[in-house]
From Swiss-Prot:
Gene Ontology BP terms: intracellular protein transmembrane transport; protein targeting; protein transport by the Sec complex
Keyword Transmembrane: yes
Topological relation to the membrane, as annotated: Multi-pass membrane protein
Gene of this entry: secY
Segments passing through the bilayer: 18-38, 76-96, 121-141, 154-174, 177-197, 212-232, 269-289, 315-335, 375-395, 398-418
Organism lineage: Bacteria, Bacillati, Actinomycetota, Actinomycetes, Mycobacteriales
Protein name: Protein translocase subunit SecY
UniProt keyword list: Cell membrane, Membrane, Protein transport, Translocation, Transmembrane, Transmembrane helix, Transport
Localization in the cell: Cell membrane
Gene3D superfamilies noted in UniProt: SecY subunit domain
Length: 438
């Protein structure tokens, strides 16, 4: 592996991509440390500490997890882009025009990316406006009595909203730069470094509050989860494919045997990111409703969220989170892998699965195999995401868990890490170097 890493640095083009990616990630972490103008940073920190100890502490920790501590600086981070991506992906099933764009290849994908950008900016404006409005009237963080925004004039509030929206656009631009000119998926890598940046502080918190024995147990559990995740992520069902010989001009092509790899976890970490992003929406709605009513009384929605969606050990919370992961796993697999299209491509180039007729029977067979491996893959994702949260919640005696050591964070970090390593490996293999993974 060391020799492969040295080879990647010796290759000029690959070295440029790796250094470019690292440079953007460093720039992202530096920009993430800058608070929004007009915001009392110390008061925000104090309010965050009070809020994470309350009933919605899990959600505040979750938002900070994905944004790399953006909530501490009163910024929006990557959340608008994630939400926009979810909506655009859902629209490909609902709106025929989006389905046509998805089938148009690179041109259609570029158009959908453009729609995602526009929607992300609109959501960033909406989210920034909501955060500033809630922070101005004291309804952003539960139990917070501090003055977060000192100057509450219209001009000052508009400037804060514009700066927060510009920050979200900058984060989106950084992610797309990494995807286009660097290595790996840009937005996933930004989430990755956001989680990694919080590990030392959260580890120290566990060590100080729970002692060395609990800290060692948590590290051991995280190590076991990492080994299990890597094992499952590398698992795949290989469907043999043969290509018939055919004459093109004066040359004979085909006659080779290969395989079609179908991963056990075909969807990757996307379902976990989508489900974790959606789980905080009920709390945002609750805050808006509570702010609109002046904090007087509690609606049925407020009571439902406070009772069932605030405690990660609650059975309703676990079932909803687990169900969202399974839903997004099936949904994302159906969007990214189309058995009919794959069967048509194989038939076009003279490929066939031994024992299966080309065309419709091949598509039905691929659909059957995919459905059989997607179910255990979705259950695996849900179990890894839910069980460590429950165990750590019980071990803390009811305190809010440290999310960077939970299943959601481990899944995201391992999934993004493996995907990035595989991209580097493919670049090395194209240049006749030995890869990382053997």
């Amino acid at each position: 592996m060391l020799s492969a890493f040295i080879s990647s640095l010796r290759t000029v083009d690959l070295r440029r991509k790796i250094l470019f990616t690292l440079g953007i990630l460093v720039l992202y972490r530096v920009s993430a440390a800058l608070p929004s103008p007009g915001v009392n940073y110390r008061h925000v920190q104090q309010c965050i500490q009070e809020a994470t100890a309350g009933e919605a502490g899990e959600i505040y920790s979750l938002i900070n997890l994905f944004s790399g501590g953006a909530l501490l600086k009163l910024t929006v981070g990557v959340m608008p882009y994630i939400t926009a991506s979810i909506i655009v992906q859902l629209l490909t099933v609902v709106i025929p025009r989006f389905e046509e764009l998805r089938k148009e290849g690179q041109a259609g994908q570029a158009k959908m990316t453009q729609y995602t950008r526009y929607l992300a900016i609109a959501l960033a404006v909406l989210q920034a406006t909501s955060i500033v409005a809630l922070a101005a009237n004291g309804g952003l963080l539960q139990g917070c009595q501090e003055d977060i925004i000192s100057d509450q004039s219209i001009f000052s509030l508009v400037v804060i909203v514009l700066v927060m929206t510009g920050g979200a656009a900058l984060v989106m631009w950084m992610g797309e730069l990494i995807t286009e000119r660097g290595i790996g998926n840009g937005m996933s890598l930004l989430i990755f470094v956001g989680i990694a940046a919080r590990i030392p502080a959260e580890g120290k918190q566990i060590l100080d509050s729970r002692g060395g024995v609990i800290f060692a147990a948590v590290c051991l559990a995280a190590l076991v989860i990492i080994v299990g995740v890597v094992f499952v992520e590398q698992g795949q069902r290989r469907i043999p494919v043969q290509y018939a010989k055919r004459m093109v001009g004066r040359r004979m092509y085909g006659g080779t045997s290969t395989y079609l790899p179908l991963k056990v976890n075909q969807a990757g970490v996307i379902p976990v990111i989508f489900a974790s992003s959606l789980i905080y929406i009920p709390h945002l709605i609750t805050q808006l409703v509570r702010s609109g009513s002046g904090g007087v009384g509690k609606s049925w929605w407020d009571k439902f969220v406070g009772t069932y969606l605030s405690d990660p050990a609650d059975p309703v919370y676990i079932n909803i989170y687990f169900g969202l992961i399974i839903f997004f796993t099936y949904f994302y697999v159906s969007v990214t892998f189309n058995p009919d299209e794959r069967a048509d491509e194989m038939k076009k180039f003279g490929g066939f699965i031994p024992g299966i007729r080309p065309g419709r029977p091949t598509a039905d067979y691929l659909r059957y195999v995919l459905s059989r491996i997607t179910l255990p893959g979705s259950i695996y994702l849900g179990a890894i995401a839910v069980l460590p949260n429950l165990f750590l919640q019980i071990g803390n005696g009811g305190e809010v868990q440290n999310l960077p050591f939970g299943g959601t964070a481990v899944l995201i970090m391992i999934g993004v890490g493996l995907d990035t390593v595989k991209q580097i490996e493919s670049q090395l293999m194209q240049r006749n170097y030995e890869g990382f993974l053997k």
